[in-house]
Swiss-Prot record:
Homodimer. NCBIfam families: cyt_deam_tetra, PRK05578.1. This is Cytidine deaminase. It is an enzyme of class 3 (hydrolase). Residues 3-131 form the CMP/dCMP-type deaminase domain. Zn(2+) binds at residues 54, 89, 92. It comes from the Bacteria. SUPFAM superfamilies: Cytidine deaminase-like (SSF53927). Keywords: Hydrolase, Metal-binding, Zinc. This enzyme scavenges exogenous and endogenous cytidine and 2'-deoxycytidine for UMP synthesis.
Length: 133
């Protein structure tokens, strides 16, 4: 599948407006592709900080709610900030790992359209699974 990063960037710029970030103002949007379907998520902050939900986990919850367990082919994470070199937090990396394969592609996309591309094993060495995939 050829990835149209311009389209993804444009779509996630729209989706990120739904992020609820009254505390940090650090808006993030995520799009997962699984079974040739797109699933979206945004970060949702809470006054009780540990309750905050990251965009990646929000998108995974959307996917599982919509179609059940599926294998993620692509993860696109958009950071609406001027801070360069963003990437998913450790908790999100482990959560993505649960639904990914070694071939799953992760794109970290910045506001200025610059991006970094990774495979899941590159960003999470020794991820934990309680079952064989």
């Amino acid at each position: 599948m050829k990835v149209d990063l311009d389209w993804v960037h444009h779509k996630l710029q729209e989706v990120v407006n739904h992020a609820y970030t009254p505390f940090s103002k650090f808006k993030v949007a995520c799009m997962l592709v699984a079974n040739n379907q797109a699933f979206y998520g945004v970060n949702i902050e809470n006054a009780s900080y540990p309750v905050t939900l990251c965009a990646e986990r929000s998108a995974i919850a959307n996917m599982v709610t919509s179609i059940g367990k599926a294998t993620i082919d692509y993860v696109f994470v958009y950071f609406d900030t001027k801070t360069p070199t963003n990437s998913p937090c450790g908790m999100c990396r482990q959560n993505i790992f649960e639904f990914a394969t070694d071939k799953t592609q992760l794109f970290c996309i910045e506001k200025d359209k610059s991006f970094k591309q990774f495979t899941i094993p590159e960003i999470l060495k020794g991820g934990f699974r309680s079952y064989e995939q």
